[in-house]
């Protein structure tokens, strides 16, 4: 949820707009199971084994893209540098990714990378959503929710300069 809020705030959404967006949101409409198992519940679990996720995540990414487009935001180049940083986990290399900064390590132009894709990577709950695959020079890298490796990444904003305090909330039981 933090990545979604951070992205929408960076895109220029106001509190009232965010309230309206999330009030009208029906999460079940963003869950897109693989087409061949829609009517056969048992096969959904086979897909978990085969594709590493119950849901594809394409509808979620499409929803992000549509909402961001209303503010004219499509890729990281549409935002001022440093405005948005998202965290994702590269399971293939056991590394935490800070997006867009670390995309250059995969040979990807940071400014042209879709924010909706980065957001999908950052909130892709393992085994619930299929992972996103990023290609590097050696192989495809499996990328999932940043919370796998760093669930509370306030350190991203610590640049050594004195700034306003950053307020974060961590919910746990």
Residue ranges of model-derived segments:
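Patatin-like phospholipase
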Residues: 7-173
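Gly/Ala-rich beta-loop-alpha elbow adjacent to hydrolase catalytic centers
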Residues: 2
């Amino acid at each position: 949820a933090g990545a979604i809020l951070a992205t929408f705030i960076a895109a220029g959404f106001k509190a009232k707009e965010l309230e309206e967006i999330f009030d009208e949101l029906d999460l079940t409409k963003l869950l897109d199971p693989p087409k061949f198992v829609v009517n056969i519940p048992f096969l959904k679990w086979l897909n978990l084994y085969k594709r590493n996720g119950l849901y594809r995540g394409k509808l979620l990414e499409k929803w992000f893209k549509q909402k961001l487009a209303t503010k004219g935001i499509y890729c990281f180049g549409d935002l001022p540098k440093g405005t948005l940083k998202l965290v994702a986990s590269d399971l293939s290399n056991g590394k935490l990714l800070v997006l867009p900064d670390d995309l250059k390590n995969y040979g990807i132009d940071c400014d042209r990378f879709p924010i909706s894709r980065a957001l999908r990577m950052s909130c892709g709950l393992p085994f619930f959503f299929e992972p996103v695959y990023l290609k590097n020079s050696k192989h495809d890298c499996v990328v999932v929710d940043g919370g796998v490796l760093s669930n509370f990444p306030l350190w991203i904003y610590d640049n050594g300069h004195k700034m306003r305090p950053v307020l974060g909330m961590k919910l746990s039981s």
